[in-house]
């Protein structure tokens, strides 16, 4: 994080300490449990090492809302990632390893509550959109006066699971050309072979990009980044 900020990155997307449910729960979810004090320590370590103060965006949108609300009240991050479509992820990018799977509905009443709480606390929402239904939900919150423009969204391409959007230039162009007024977008690509091509398209179109160990731990196919 520190080297990225000192090299010019403006937003740090943080994953503080957390654990994932070992199995699908009775309510159909498989989500994350957060170590709230650990998040504060990670943020402070970043502040201490940076020459300029970055925007801190708390991730792990697959955390449960009551605990994430507690996290926001306790620490007031600049931004928080909020999944605006159902979580249905299948991290099976390494052959031979058991995939990590996540499930959560994130219905509109929950999204409305996210918008109310973040508005009261002065925390900016990042609306995660794994497919275009997430944009529709964000528009819905904007029309109801619960989200304030500009709405900041992230398009996720190549993230496997039931909310998958293919990592192609055509998909990137579709997202760009259907962007509603009052929206700004960021792009994340989880595909080692296609990442740099799609991010280049996003930049040319005037969008923003997200890179790092979560999105793609490879510098090129089969070559892991060292940190």
Model-assigned labels for residue ranges:
Residues 23-58, 113-118, 173-182:
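Alpha-helix-loop-beta-strand connector modules within alpha/beta enzyme cores
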Residues 5-6, 73, 119, 203:
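Non-catalytic positions within long, well-ordered alpha-helices that form the structural scaffold/packing
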Residues 6-9, 77, 206-207:
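A structural motif
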Residues 1-3, 64-72, 195-199:
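Short, acidic/polar
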